[in-house]
């Protein structure tokens, strides 16, 4: 009798173990999908897009001068990143050199924009007198197209790196100011009231309540500043540069090298998305509670 009961217990234990293994497998698959699913969908989406592009280009529906094959674009990109044209060539240097030049100017301009924009936005949000003084200038300059200022900057600064960095800074600074400003202004009153109940001083209110609440707004402003800054890079290099990705686009257009032009445009998209993803990782590091709230 005991032997039969032992057999039943062993069978039940095996069934339980099998069920636990199935649950573990399902959890592991769910965890893998949550972690890598979005990347897999993105890769699949891009693969389909470039395959359709390649087929459409090879069909001859559009002149290759206007729409080269995706393979031609990637070939031009690889060649530009791995080789260097001789100094006497129509397009001297390599994509790598022009990319480094543009990224250097973007980094400097974006850094200056953060140094100016974050304190200015926080100050405008925290002081109504500063807000009244600066807000008309901020809105006026933020709504002004940067391209309209290029002739003025060329007149004052010439065709120099200073002119390009100035345009990049002005393109990136206003989204940062406006977002930091909005972050301070929209801080929940209940949080401030609770902190005051616990005896928080004015400085503690600012650094322990207002600033952490504003961090996501600042990160969003920097993300917008990256996009605007890249636009500033291209504008500055097209109209007043002799080097950089904007200059390279112009020279590729002048020589009807559409493969190179599309390669540079594709590279700009990759750079922009990479920098924005970098800011997301930065936000996850300096504001980990945001990741908890999104779960």
Predicted feature descriptions by range:
Residues 166, 170, 202-236, 263, ...:
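Transmembrane alpha-helices
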């Amino acid at each position: 009798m005991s032997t039969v009961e032992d057999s039943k217990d062993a069978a039940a234990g095996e069934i339980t173990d099998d069920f636990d293994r199935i649950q573990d497998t399902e959890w592991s698959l769910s965890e893998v999908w949550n972690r890598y699913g979005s990347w897999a969908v993105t890769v699949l989406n891009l693969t389909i897009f470039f395959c359709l592009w390649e087929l459409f280009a090879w069909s001859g529906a559009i002149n290759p001068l206007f729409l080269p094959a995706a393979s031609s674009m990637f070939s031009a990109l690889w060649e530009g990143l791995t080789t260097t044209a001789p100094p006497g060539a129509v397009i001297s240097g390599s994509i790598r050199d022009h990319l480094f030049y543009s990224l250097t100017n973007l980094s400097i301009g974006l850094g200056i924009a953060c140094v100016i924009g974050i304190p200015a936005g926080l100050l405008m949000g925290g002081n109504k007198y500063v807000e009244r003084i600066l807000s008309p200038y901020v809105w006026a300059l933020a709504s002004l197209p940067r391209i309209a200022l290029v002739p003025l900057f060329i007149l004052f600064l010439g065709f120099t790196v200073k002119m390009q960095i100035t345009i990049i800074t002005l393109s990136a600074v206003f989204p940062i100011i406006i977002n930091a400003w909005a972050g301070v202004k929209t801080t929940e009153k209940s949080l401030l009231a609770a902190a005051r109940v616990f005896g928080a001083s004015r400085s503690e209110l600012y650094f322990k309540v207002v600033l952490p609440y504003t961090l996501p707004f600042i990160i969003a402003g920097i993300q917008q500043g990256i996009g605007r800054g890249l636009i500033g890079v291209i504008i500055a290099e097209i109209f007043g540069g002799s080097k950089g990705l904007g200059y390279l686009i112009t020279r590729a257009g002048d020589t009807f090298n559409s493969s190179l032009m599309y390669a540079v445009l594709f590279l700009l998209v990759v750079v922009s998305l990479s920098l924005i993803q970098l800011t997301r990782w930065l936000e996850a590091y300096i504001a980990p509670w945001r990741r908890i709230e999104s779960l």
